[in-house]
């Protein structure tokens, strides 16, 4: 029994370490791609980020479920609100005189495209974490079955 408990502790530690390394690698890869191609500052827009994160939060609260479901719903809500933010930005561009001034279309479109970027980036991170949570739940169920038999 003690050996099984010790083995589980070691495996859980390595599982959490691999999750940490994976998330750091994903974030590093995205930041590296941003830095290699352009100015880092153009990828940050506070209102766009708030729309995506707040929308994802309220989406996960409304959808309900257990912790894994809420985390998965947070990622799904981030993608959906990312696209809603994009559509809102395009509608705002179309309603204003920005279409007439061709010099302003590029920067305005870049800001509008940030919301789907944020949404998918959050979805990737939450997807990795949800998969790990599902894996941990499966391992716990298998361990309980072994202990019962």
Tell me what each language-model feature is:
Residues 131-149:
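Cytosol/matrix-facing juxtamembrane amphipathic
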